[in-house]
Design a protein with these regions (language model features):
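Active-site and adjacent substrate-binding regions of carbohydrate-active enzymes
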Residues: 1-492, 498, 502-585
């Protein structure tokens, strides 16, 4: 039965997102570059997989020196991807399958080829002279860190035409816009509307923390930036209800939650600090990195949601970890210098876990059950590999592998014409790893992901429930309870942070805040116990579930009844990297 769009304006709280690099997804016209029509051709696949919302990487006209994050014209679709009509068709076709679409929006900077910058650099007194940030010397805002430390030496770059320095937080070919100029603010708001009018369901807001600069600050998370986001949100709420803003703010949890405002800024934020800690936890075979960061994560304001992810189109960023943990991550996951990019590791999920299926399943099971909406990266559902010999972050942006045919079924162009070579190595190459083969094989990772998503879809507790970390005697075992009370929109109870009443550096107590309302709908499960073995070896665990005495425990994937909870400890054995999702009824 075809799915239809839910009318719930808070759809994003229970959605599964899928990140698409249009350039690498499917080439419909044989020019070697993926395009919007190609993506339309593959919507049936995405519907089958069970995702609810696509996140499109920037599709705007661009010189493509930073994967399209260097926008040359905000008002046009890049000719290689198609035209505005193709985007409208894509949105309509996706909606007809119950899938929403959000687009990346790069507000912080443009390409130096953008006509605004060309005009701005032409003199000190043209109408766009102050649309960017110009100075006579490069000494301003020394407290602002350099983000691409491996390629840029300064946040200032000299422009020989204007004979001045301009400010940039990323590549020097990406000058920052000047948001202190009200004309820039208005121009950006009209671009937002221009694209929302195509029917898009919202935006992933690229690099939002850096919109403003102020003397004596790091130029991140400034009050002016939050004021701008409130303005943006109010304009969207007024004219485009049900659309979502998802912030890319690579920040510590306490700064991150500010991007939700009082439910009046972004609806969602990526949980950047959690991501590397999931990789750390499985390599250390200890739950501590995860429980520690959950304990530091403040409660979500009403109507908000985390975006959770394992991998994306960028490097596995290590900005939000200590120096010691960064060294550990480089040693464990990025030993070859070619794998290091910017402040992180440019590798895909499967090679990171050495192609271990149980480990890939474990990480995804955590991704699908921790509080937030999971965001998958194209190809990871196949356990696609990477190519560390490619420059910048292209290692993880190779063509999607559809079939074992020429070019992996991605394009009919000559191999030499492809935007990047598809993987052809014996382990991850398209002849071994592709959609066609995995679709036929019921035991494939692709089918496993599809089944997990269909189970997740049946239990809104994963999107809407509160979390409490349970005390477990075995440090290699992570266990938590997600619970949801259907009559209240978000069942976060009595707890200051979303890890319930965690204390110190680990889970030590079980909250007594869980109870069941008598008026909850009959038969609807409200409580899911999730247990994960982070170790390579089988592990026993003993959980204190006394307050659930006499309740029934049912394994969710197979609906298999497990022993009821008796007095005191509930004992479980988990296989290597094993996990369980249990409903407690
Ligand atoms: C995007 C990157 C991009 C950068 C500059 C980011 O945060 O995810 O891919 O290079 O912004 O636009």
């Amino acid at each position: 039965m075809p799915r239809s769009l839910t009318e719930n304006p808070r759809w994003y709280q229970t959605a599964v997102f899928y990140e698409v690099f249009i350039r690498g997804f499917f080439d419909s016209n044989g020019d070697g570059i993926g395009d919007l029509r190609g993506l339309i051709d593959k919507l049936d696949y995405l519907e089958w997989l069970g995702v609810d919302c696509l996140w499109l990487l920037p599709f705007y006209s661009s010189p493509m020196r930073d994967g399209g994050y260097d926008i040359g014209n905000y008002e046009e679709v890049d000719a290689a991807y198609g035209a505005r009509e193709d985007l409208i068709k894509l949105v309509d076709e996706a909606h007809a399958r119950g899938i929403r679409i959000i687009a990346d929006l790069v507000m912080n900077h443009t390409s130096d080829q953008h006509i605004w910058f060309q005009e701005s650099r032409s003199s000190g007194d043209n109408p766009k002279a102050d649309w960017y940030i110009w100075r006579d010397d490069d000494s301003g805002w020394p407290e602002a860190r350099i983000i691409f430390t491996d390629v840029e030496q300064s946040n200032w770059a000299w422009d020989s035409e204007r004979q001045q320095y301009y400010w940039h937080r990323f590549y020097s070919h990406q000058p920052d816009l000047n948001y202190d100029n009200p004309e820039v603010v208005e121009a950006m708001l009209s671009i937002v509307k221009l694209w929302l009018d195509t029917g898009l369901d919202g935006f992933r807001l690229d690099a939002v923390p850096y919109l403003y600069q102020r003397d004596g600050t790091s130029g991140e998370n400034l009050p002016e930036t939050h004021a701008f986001l409130r303005r943006l949100r109010s304009e969207i709420d007024a004219r485009y209800p049900g659309r979502v803003l998802l912030a890319e703010a690579n920040q510590w949890p306490t700064d991150l939650v500010d991007y939700f405002g009082s439910s009046d800024e972004c609806h969602m934020c990526f949980h950047f600090p959690l991501m590397p800690r999931m990789f750390m936890a499985v390599r250390r075979e200890q739950r501590l990195p995860i429980t520690e960061i959950l304990a530091q994560t403040p409660e979500l304001p009403d109507g908000c949601q985390w975006g959770l992810f394992l991998r994306n189109h960028d490097e596995l960023t290590l900005e939000m970890v200590s120096d010691e943990d960064r060294d550990f991550m480089y040693a464990e996951y990025g030993a070859d210098p070619r794998m290091k990019r910017h402040l992180g590791i440019s590798r895909r999920l499967a090679p990171l876990v050495e192609n271990s299926r149980p480990l890939a399943e474990l990480l995804h099971a955590m991704l699908f059950s921790l509080p937030g909406s999971p965001v998958l990266y194209y190809g990871d559902e196949l356990m696609m590999g990477d190519n560390v010999y490619l420059g910048d972050r292209d290692a993880v942006r190779t063509p999607m592998q559809w079939t074992p045919d020429r070019n992996g079924g991605f394009s009919r162009a000559d191999f030499a014409q492809l935007y990047l070579p598809p993987l052809m190595d014996p382990v991850y190459g398209y002849q071994a790893v592709n959609v066609e083969a995995e679709y036929r094989d019921q035991g494939s990772f692709l089918h496993w992901v599809q089944k997990m998503l269909s189970v997740r879809r049946r239990h809104e507790v994963f999107g809407l429930g509160s979390i409490e970390i349970l005390a477990v005697d075995n440090p290699s075992v992570l266990a938590f309870i997600r619970s949801y009370y259907p009559e209240s929109s978000l069942a976060v109870k009595d707890s200051e942070n979303f890890a319930g009443n965690l204390e110190g550096d680990d889970a030590s107590q079980i909250s007594t805040s869980l109870d069941f309302r008598e008026d909850s709908k009959e038969g609807e499960e409200r409580c899911v116990l999730c247990i994960f073995n982070l170790s390579r070896f089988a592990q026993p665990a003993s959980l204190d579930l006394a307050r659930f005495k006499e309740r029934q425990v049912t394994e969710l994937l197979g609906r298999v009844p497990f022993p009821d909870i008796q007095e005191g400890d509930y004992r479980i054995t988990l296989g290597p990297h094993g996990f369980y999702w249990f409903s407690i009824t």
